[in-house]
Amino acid sequence: AAEGENEEWVDLYPEFAKIADEEGFPAIAHTFRNVSKVEEEHEKRYRKLLSNIENGTVFSDSEEIEWQCRNCGYVFRGKKAPEVCPACAHPQAFFERKKNNY
């Protein structure tokens, strides 16, 4: 997936922008350039996730943190997310590091 995102932001969208400019559509070219920036961010996310998978840190941390179940909202504090949610029985894959971005 990361390679696909790389191709999009390095090759495809810049080429689309160039063509749009050449054909007299500067607003569309501008949009393609902005989409290219989004695709670059997607690549970064995929590569970070791959690194976390390879390092075994998707569901573990060196310090105690809060993990939140994305299904029911249950919050667990520990170095590792539970194998199964104690509240709704969903698997560990439903846990993420709790965000307080509200």
Predicted features, each with a name:
Residues 1-102:
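Non-heme di-metal
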